[in-house]
Amino acid sequence: MEGSRLRLRGVEAGDLAALGAIRAEPGVREWWGDPQPDDLVAPDDGDLLVIDVNGAVAGAIQYEEVTDPQYRSAGIDLFLGESWQGRGLGREAVGVLVRHLIESRGHHRLTIDPAVANERAIRCYEAVGFARVGVMRQYERAADGSWHDGLLMELLADTWRA
């Protein structure tokens, strides 16, 4: 999948060290927790794609599909290395994946669930067209062991701006 500045592609063996290093960066670890060895090889929730910028691993984006025809939805999540943040690459990566999931995979509803305190991520998702649905209290355990709230956000295919 191609964007104007990036490509989303499958994970290759040579990507694992770079992805592991990104997951260990303080600004990524804050929201994703400590990297687990199998997270990058076999994520437990869907397909993992590398965010590739001119051959460099900038981060990863993953999605999990609900293929039941009564639902046709998918959840998305991503992480971007600290040195790649603030350039609109997260927004572009989410937009590329949204287009694929709606136009190629036929999903009618997409969700994402950033931490309520992750304002940068929330702005990114809103810029793509995700809307706030509600707060999920004590949704996820933070790296320091405390619980934090998550924000459920959704994007519906019929309201998406292509």
Task: Please tell me what each predicted stretch does.
Residues G10, E30-Q85, R91, H100, ...:
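Acetyl-CoA-dependent GNAT
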Residues G86-H100, I122-A127:
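Conserved acetyl-CoA-binding loop-helix of GNAT-fold acetyltransferases
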Residues T111-P114, A131-H148:
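Conserved catalytic-core motifs of GNAT/GCN5-like acyltransferases
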